[in-house]
UniProtKB/Swiss-Prot annotation:
Principal EC category: ligase
Catalytic activity of the protein: L-glutamyl-tRNA(Gln) + L-glutamine + ATP + H2O = L-glutaminyl-tRNA(Gln) + L-glutamate + ADP + phosphate + H(+)
Subunit structure comment from the entry: Heterotrimer of A, B and C subunits.
Pfam families assigned: Amidase
This protein's encoding gene: gatA
Swiss-Prot/TrEMBL keywords: ATP-binding, Ligase, Nucleotide-binding, Protein biosynthesis
SUPFAM superfamilies per UniProt: Amidase signature (AS) enzymes (SSF75304)
Protein's organism: Bacillus cereus (strain AH187)
Enzyme Commission number(s) of this protein: 6.3.5.7
This protein's name: Glutamyl-tRNA(Gln) amidotransferase subunit A
HAMAP family registered for this protein in UniProt: GatA
Active site residues according to the UniProt entry: K78, S153, S177
Summary of the function given for this chain in its UniProt record: Allows the formation of correctly charged Gln-tRNA(Gln) through the transamidation of misacylated Glu-tRNA(Gln) in organisms which lack glutaminyl-tRNA synthetase. The reaction takes place in the presence of glutamine and ATP through an activated gamma-phospho-Glu-tRNA(Gln).
Length: 485
């Protein structure tokens, strides 16, 4: 039995009782990485020397009264979250040798909590993708079946947890990039409310949509991690000054009287029968525990995909303009003048998907098309947000599938961008509205790949979605199943 089969609270007790050491946890992580990483390819960079030194330092503090629950816990960090002195590439050749000189706020908070960073995790380049096949280095595989994708863009973050390489990880979610891979890999992934977690130190893709969040084996562990990284940060102008409650206090298993909304759009066209049936089965479980549910409508959801790709690509076009070979990142050697430097550096440094989205965003922002595309997309975004607010006036949570289908095979969709984009139709509306949502395991498809249940909450009401997710998790055995890698 792996140490990582235990929860954070169980491991904390073992540490305090001196049944295990922090070094044991770190060595468990690196041993598992040595055993499976050649197949999974979840990591881009390991930090073995520093991790082992930190573990030795913390071993001397075991049993101290001020040790928090995350003391000594091994974590992986998505490679678009900067780490001081530890290579941060965004899985792009553009930043292949970038060593940041500061830590992201979330990394600072986790260091203060005495977690240990095992390494940096693979992803779709600059967080643009749904399968991890867009990594500029190599594709991560799904631990449940290596022929299948782990999802994206936080595919490395989800795969590392599912494979037992780390206890938990950080990802980022712009249009579903935590929840979709969590669903595909059979783990728990939360996108917090926009502004709940600082984005300082997150390499920007789409600044009005990006949000850092936790990926874990259980809902309880997820709540521990969010508790540690949440809160106001003066370094992030979009960080919200909203009190962070005690997320653990609500994990009682009680959902009696809970009002659940189920959008008909989330069970309709484009959603596979397996995903639909898994949600209905989950609703029956929650109904048996005293919750009630009704079908509702989010009428503007059908426009979410187009709205998202116009807005996110426009923001990416602006954010990624800084990578030009002048200040940092790679620099093309094939240069005769300044224009050559810009053009050749960007052509050689960016992958196809990143260039595709930059071109789309540049077009949407160009004069003559701005009102027709970008401005109209912003207006539709407001309508989508209003739809959520209207539903939440009468219901506590919204529930539906996380993804239309289970994971697909490697290479199956990578050459068809529109089909690939459609994998995010159920997660994108949440980002556009800025509300929180969690994906928890809820069954398996005919291909024996995991399915995820998405629970969406009101702004800054992560506590309620944790309560519902935990109650469902404890009433079922989906979370106890592990990839047999």
């Amino acid at each position: 039995m792996s140490l990582f089969d235990h929860s954070v609270s169980e491991l904390h007790k073992k540490l305090n009782n001196k049944e295990i050491s922090v070094t044991d946890l770190v060595e468990e992580s690196y041993k598992r990485i040595a055993d499976v990483e050649d197949n999974v390819k979840a990591f881009l960079t390991l930090d073995e020397e520093n991790a082992r030194a930190k573990a030795k330092e913390l071993d001397a503090k075991i049993g101290a009264e001020d040790n928090g629950l995350l003391f000594g816990m091994p974590i992986g960090v998505k490679d678009n979250i900067v780490t001081n002195g530890l290579r941060t590439t965004c899985a792009s050749k553009m930043l292949a040798n970038f060593d940041p000189i500061y830590d992201a706020t979330v990394v600072q908070k986790l260091k203060a909590a005495d977690t240990i960073t095992i390494g940096k995790l693979n992803m779709d380049e600059f967080a643009m993708g749904s399968s991890n096949e867009n990594s500029g280095f190599y594709a991560t595989k799904n631990p449940w079946n290596l022929d299948y994708v782990p999802g994206g863009s936080s595919g490395g973050s989800a795969a590392a947890v599912a494979a037992g390489e780390v206890l938990f990880s950080l990802g980022s979610d712009t249009g579903g990039s935590i929840r979709q891979p969590a669903a595909y890999c059979g783990v728990v992934g939360l996108k917090p409310t926009y502004g709940r977690v600082s984005r300082y130190g997150l390499v920007a893709f789409a600044s009005s949509l990006d949000q850092i969040g936790p990926i874990t084996r259980t809902v309880e562990d997820n709540a521990y991690l969010l508790q540690a990284i949440s809160g106001l940060d003066r370094m992030d102008a979009t960080s919200a000054n909203v009190e962070v409650g005690n997320y653990l206090a609500g994990l009682t298993g009680d959902v009696k009287g809970l009002r659940i909304a189920v959008p008909k759009e989330y069970l309709g066209e484009g959603v596979g029968e397996e995903a639909r049936e898994s949600v209905l089965a989950a609703l029956k479980v929650l109904e048996g525990m005293g919750a009630t549910w009704e079908e509702v409508s989010l009428p503007h959801s059908k426009y979410a995909l187009a709205t998202y790709y116009l807005l996110s690509s426009s923001e990416a076009s602006a954010n990624l303009s800084r990578f030009d070979g002048v200040r940092y990142g790679v620099r093309s050697d094939n240069v005769n003048n300044l224009m050559d430097l810009y053009k050749n550096t960007r052509s050689e440094g960016f992958g196809d998907e990143v260039k595709r989205r930059i071109m789309l965003g540049t077009f949407a922002l160009s004069s003559g098309y701005y009102d027709a595309y970008y401005k109209k997309a912003q207006q539709v975004r407001t309508l989508i947000k209003n739809d959520f607010e209207n539903v939440f006036a009468n219901y506590d949570v919204i529930i539906g599938p996380t993804t239309p289908t289970p994971a697909f095979k490697v290479g199956e969709k990578v050459d068809d961008p529109m089909t690939m984009y459609a994998n995010d139709i159920l997660t994108i509306p949440v980002n556009l509205a800025g509300v929180p949502a969690i994906s928890v395991p809820c069954g398996f498809g005919a291909n024996n790949m995991p399915l995820g249940l998405q629970i969406i909450g009101k702004h800054f009401d992560e506590a309620t979605i944790y309560r519902v997710a935990h109650a469902f998790e404890q009433a079922t055995d989906h979370h106890t199943k592990k990839a047999s890698l």
